[in-house]
Design a protein with these regions (language model features):
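Short, well-ordered beta-strand segments in beta-rich or mixed alpha/beta enzyme
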Residues: 35-43, 75-110
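An amphipathic, aromatic/His-enriched active-site/gating alpha helix that lines ligand/cofactor pockets
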Residues: 2, 7-13, 63-72, 97-133, ...
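N-terminal twin-arginine translocation
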Residues: 1-8, 14-31
Length: 137
C-alpha cells in the first residue's frame, strides 16, 4: 500500500473516533433506557454571576463528572436571540447529560450535590426556573 493511502485511512479513522468521542453515546443502553439531558433556564443575578461560575467550574462540575453514568455538563450564557423569544429574564441555560434518569437521580441524592447545588441556586434572581428533561436519540 502506498504511504499516501495509509495516511488517508489513518486520518479518516482518527476523525471518526474523535467525532464519536465528542458526541458521546446516544444508543439505548442494554436495559432499553436512553441517555437523558436536563435543561434548566436560569436567571442569574449579574452581581452574583462570577460566584455562580466559580462554584460551577470548581465544585459542581468536577463532582458531577465523577458520578456513574455522567456524560456531559454545560453552563451556557445567552449571547443573542436569533429567532423567537428567549425565556423571560433568563441569561443562562444549564445542560446536564446522564446515561439514564435513574443515574441522574442517584447523583441528585448525593451529599456533594446537596451541598453544591444550593450555592449555585443562591445566585438566581428567582427560584422559579424551568426544568425540562429530554431523552436523547
Amino acid at each position: 500500500m502506498k504511504r499516501r493511502s495509509c495516511l488517508k485511512i489513518l486520518l479518516a479513522t482518527t476523525g471518526m473516533v474523535a467525532t464519536r468521542a465528542a458526541n458521546g453515546p446516544v444508543a439505548a443502553a442494554a436495559d432499553g433506557q436512553h441517555p437523558i439531558e436536563l435543561h434548566l433556564d436560569l436567571a442569574v443575578d449579574p452581581v452574583k454571576e462570577a460566584e455562580m461560575l466559580r462554584v460551577f467550574e470548581k465544585e459542581f462540575k468536577p463532582a458531577a463528572s465523577r458520578q456513574p453514568g455522567f456524560i456531559a455538563i454545560k453552563m451556557l450564557k445567552l449571547s443573542s436571540t436569533l429567532r423567537g423569544p428567549a425565556p423571560a429574564g433568563c441569561n443562562y441555560q444549564f445542560v446536564l447529560s446522564f446515561a439514564s434518569e435513574d443515574l441522574r437521580q442517584k447523583w441528585v441524592a448525593t451529599p456533594i450535590h446537596k451541598a453544591t447545588w444550593p450555592k449555585i441556586e443562591s445566585t438566581f434572581t428567582s427560584p422559579n426556573y424551568s426544568r425540562l428533561l429530554y431523552e436523547v436519540y
